[in-house]
């Protein structure tokens, strides 16, 4: 087959897989923090340095700027935001296939790895939540950084790395991923060109230290160095690799009558661990949210694809591929989409209520999201309504002559008292 036709066919297949995996999200509404970030995108247009007053959101500059661009084109239409995020995921899957091809020179590994990443449910929050777009953007810039590095375009590698760092702080993982690629290519771990990557890091560190005292995540102990990090790492790693690593290793053993090579296997697990490392200091959960394993999922399916490519029995390959596709697609369609609909329910119901009534003062009790800016910013989607008309009980706001609303957790609706 002509290489151009083959590449086009593969790209179309990847696009189909990405769409098949995440199409259910297209009819979902905005969720929670989405409303706040959409408002901040307007403030960013007016003042480029606004995000530096609410750190660490300055390290989300690329995604918030993108929200503003999408909003200026499509307005408050969530389906277009979700469609764009699915497009980003497709581009990342395609770039990931290029990275696999450059590093392994194996078309089976490149095809299988990219296809598995396209439908793998583990990082679904990065694609199924508009706020998670920071992770898909970071993934895009990290992939571009690594591809430029492998092609010896070191200046562009540093430029992409800079944008990755201002998509999410965790992009610092590049400093470890580049030496791992060098090791995989049997090259010097830290060549002279590595120094150019330290230039965007110097800017990042200067900004990070300058905003340390006002960084909400640090000052409120949302992230903190402590013993909990080890347990977060272990739990997240187990959740990420189960059950597919066990399945593919079992098939490998059955088919080849041996275990995978320890050196490559251990290096792959080590690389997965490194991509999780920047996130594990969170204190609000015993494991990482799914959006934060987006890049780690690439490394993990790289391992799966490497093991898959070595299977000699085509029936076992087909069985694994069919099971992987069916289970992940089913989980995304019938489990995760419903969960995101439920997460969106409070703001979706509030939006419907505002659309059905003329502007008036309201006070909401028991709204499930603790951040009062979330319900207030829903008002931007309805002409005539403003933030000051939406009060939230428990924030010191009160009124004597206003509509009182109560969130009913059982029916998931707003009811008037």
For each feature predicted by the language model, list its residue ranges.
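Polytopic membrane enzymes that build or remodel cell-surface glycoconjugates and lipids
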Residues: 1-417
């Amino acid at each position: 087959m002509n290489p151009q036709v083959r590449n086009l066919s593969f790209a179309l297949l990847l696009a189909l897989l990405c769409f098949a995996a995440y199409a259910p999200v297209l009819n979902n509404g905005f969720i929670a923090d989405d409303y706040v970030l959409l408002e901040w995108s307007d403030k960013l247009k007016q003042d480029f340095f606004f995000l530096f007053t609410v750190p660490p959101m300055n390290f989300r500059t690329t995604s918030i700027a993108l929200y503003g661009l999408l909003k200026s084109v499509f307005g408050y239409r969530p389906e277009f935001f979700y469609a764009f995020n699915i497009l980003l995921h497709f581009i990342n899957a395609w770039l990931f296939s290029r990275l696999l091809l450059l590093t392994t020179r194996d078309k089976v590994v490149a095809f299988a790895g990219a296809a598995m990443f396209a439908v793998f449910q583990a990082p679904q929050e990065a694609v199924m939540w508009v706020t998670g777009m920071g992770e898909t953007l970071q993934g895009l810039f990290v992939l571009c950084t690594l591809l430029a590095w492998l092609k010896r375009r070191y200046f562009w590698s540093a430029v992409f790395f800079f944008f990755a760092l201002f998509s999410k702080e965790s992009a610092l993982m590049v400093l470890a991923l580049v030496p791992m690629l060098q090791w995989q290519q049997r090259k010097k771990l830290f060549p002279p060109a590595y120094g150019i990557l330290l230039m965007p890091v110097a800017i990042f560190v200067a900004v990070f230290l300058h905003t340390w005292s006002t960084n909400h995540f640090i000052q409120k102990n949302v992230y903190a160095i402590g013993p909990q990090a080890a347990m977060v790492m272990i739990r997240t790693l187990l959740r990420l690799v189960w059950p597919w690593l066990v399945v593919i290793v079992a098939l490998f053993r059955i088919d080849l009558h041996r275990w995978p090579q320890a050196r490559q296997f251990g290096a792959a697990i080590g690389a997965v661990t490194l991509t999780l490392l920047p996130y594990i200091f969170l204190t609000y959960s015993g494991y990482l949210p799914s959006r934060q394993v987006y890049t780690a999922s690439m490394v993990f399916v790289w391992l799966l694809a490497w093991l898959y490519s070595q299977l000699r029995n085509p029936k076992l390959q087909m069985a694994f591929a069919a099971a992987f596709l069916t289970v992940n697609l089913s989980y995304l369609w019938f489990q995760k989409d419903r969960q995101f609909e439920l997460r969106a329910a409070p703001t979706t119901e509030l939006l419907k209520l505002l659309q059905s009534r003329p502007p008036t003062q309201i006070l909401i009790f028991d709204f499930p999201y603790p951040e009062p800016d979330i319900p207030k910013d829903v008002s931007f989607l309805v002409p005539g309504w403003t933030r000051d008309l939406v009060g939230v009980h428990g924030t010191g706001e009160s009124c004597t002559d206003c509509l009182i609303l109560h969130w009913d957790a059982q029916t998931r609706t707003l009811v008037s008292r």
